[in-house]
């Protein structure tokens, strides 16, 4: 069993890369969240969308590998959104990909072991990330500023260097780049985990 862990700041290309990796038979480990779904997000594929009470119950029942709480303003009202992964048994005969922030990555590695994880940092300039956020629709400046601020706190160089095995510089939305990125990551995965192509 091996897992590619994609991490990176908001709108750095993690979801698009995950989708390309699924074409190489990677199985997405779906995180849970208590935030509302965005346009074009599908329950069970992008996230498991649950009510905040349900998420808090999973925490209290010790069902989570890792979770984070983010205080935000949603529709001009203070709210807390949770993100996290439940404890699940992974099939040792399958390839996996998961998207996590750095703290989640650290906890995931503690749970599954470093030898089973290949951590990829998706790097992208702030201006490009903001352009992508605006193009997603329903852009909210206050929420974007909160996310950028959280990213600056979360993605410190020392922690990145400690956890990251590989960095992808994702400068554009050129759809021709994504298959190339996925092909390289799949090749590295095959070599690292001694898998057949």
Go through each PLM region and give its residues.
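Walker A/P-loop
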Residues: 14-15
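The feature captures the helix immediately C-terminal to the Walker
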Residues: 18-19
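Small-molecule kinase domains that catalyze NTP-dependent phosphoryl transfer to phosphate-bearing small molecules
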Residues: 138-189, 195-197
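Hydrophobic anchor at the beta1->P-loop junction of P-loop NTPases
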Residues: 6
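Conserved phosphate-donor/acceptor-positioning beta-strand/loop module used by diverse small-molecule
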Residues: 95-102, 112-135
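ATP-dependent small-molecule kinase phosphotransfer cores
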Residues: 33-96, 103
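P-loop (Walker A) phosphate-binding loop of NTP-binding proteins
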Residues: 9
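Post-Walker A helix-loop "phosphate-sensing" segment adjacent to the P-loop in P-loop NTPases
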Residues: 23-30
